[in-house]
Every structure is written in structure tokens, then in C-alpha cells.
């Protein structure tokens, strides 16, 4: 059985969560500090883990007053984003505060979810993206949120962990081409997701 799967037993009641919510939020902010990478001026990748997904479920249940009986749907939605030990998963967000500017910018980014990659020593791992919801409209407008999976082989996991290798994360979309270097601290944090 996959011990990375989130079960109902992993989620505490809304009352219990309400008592620790403030401290849990501070803990998560610290935990996520080295799991975020900006790629260019408006795209950010937030790398997920079992803990970040449990936190998301707890927050959703608390804010929306979801009962334990109703949590099955949330678990089904969030479990695919828990890294399986041979991948990294990320939520990519296009973050533009001004609504008009955001709308215009997203209208040029159709298919961006197909253009996100991790580069290790020249080898490119393009993201698989969640296909259950169409993230690009028929008019070519991209969503501001994308859920990505980067699948690794044993050799690529070893290369990722090797501090002598430079790791980059990039987007090679014609309207948004950017590349960022992964710091050693971020690499160290993300490497914990591999079994």
C-alpha cells in the first residue's frame, strides 16, 4: 500500500484544527519557504508534498465547513498531487494583481502547461499536467493555476540529488520564455520527495 496516500485518518476534525490553525499556518509558511521557485516575473512553482496536501485539505474542510463524511471527494482531488516517490509535483501559478493585465496576459499563454520543464545536466523533463480539467480554453486563454507532475527515472533522481549538477526550471512558451536555477537549499528540500 502507498503510505503517501492521504486517508481520512490523516485529517483531524474541524474543531481540533481550529485550535491549532494559527500555529499550523506558521509551520506551513516555514515549510514551504524552500519549495517555491519563481520562473520569470509572474510564474511561480509551488512544489507539493504529502504535508502540503494535508494542509490544503484541512484548510478547505475548515473554511468550507466540510464534514468528515464529505471529505472523500477532497481526498480524491488532492491525492493525485502527492508526489509518489518518483516524481515532483507542483502547482504553477501565474500571479498578476491587476485583473485586466492578468486577463490580457493569460490570453497569450495558451498551452503554457505543456512548456514547463526541469533541466538536469542538459536533460529536459517536461511536465505532465492534470488533464481532467482543460487549463487552456479553445480561444487560447490559459488558466492562472496549473497542476504539474515531473516524472523521474532512477538515473534522473540520482542526477537531481548530485550537488555537482546544475538544475534549472524553465518555461519555453513563445510568449513567456524564462529559466531559473534551483538553489542547493531548494534542491535539498525537493530531494526529500524521492524514495
Language model: regions and residue ranges:
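Long, contiguous binding/interaction regions
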Residues: 1-87, 95-195
